[in-house]
């Protein structure tokens, strides 16, 4: 059996939730699929206006994580929801720039500033 992605999903308000990614490495196909299932279920059941992905602990991820983020974004866009990304390290942020995904996600230096921005939207 492969790695398991440690994550926590917390509702900050009725409109804002945070997915705290606690695993330093996110590359196992089955683990990413399982994490995606948990997050998608949360989105279906709660329909947060804003979902913040906190990458503070993450040092490496495979391209499957980009797919996960795009899938969640597509589901949330259907009801005018938004995905924000916080505390991502510069090397991982570079992946978003290279793929032009930095144009569709908003980035914040830390979880607190992302929550603050979402609260003022």
Model-derived segments and their meaning:
Residues 14, 90, 112:
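Residues that form or immediately flank small-molecule/cofactor binding pockets and catalytic motifs
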Residues 114, 118-121:
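A short, charged, amphipathic alpha-helix used as a generic interaction element across diverse proteins
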Residues 4-37:
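STAS-typified acidic loop motif
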Residues 26-104:
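Amphipathic alpha-helical interaction surfaces in cytosolic regulatory modules
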């Amino acid at each position: 059996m492969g790695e398991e992605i440690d994550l926590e999903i917390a509702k900050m308000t009725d409109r804002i939730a945070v997915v705290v990614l606690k695993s330093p490495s996110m590359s196992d196909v089955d683990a990413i699929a399982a994490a995606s299932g948990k997050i998608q279920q949360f989105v279906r059941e709660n329909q947060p206006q804003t979902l913040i992905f906190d990458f503070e602990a993450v040092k490496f991820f495979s391209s499957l994580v980009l797919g996960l983020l795009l899938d969640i974004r597509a589901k949330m866009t259907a009801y005018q929801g938004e995905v924000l990304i916080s505390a991502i390290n510069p090397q991982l942020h570079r992946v978003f720039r290279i793929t032009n995904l930095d144009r569709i996600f908003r980035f914040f230096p830390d979880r607190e500033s992302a929550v603050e921005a979402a609260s003022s939207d």
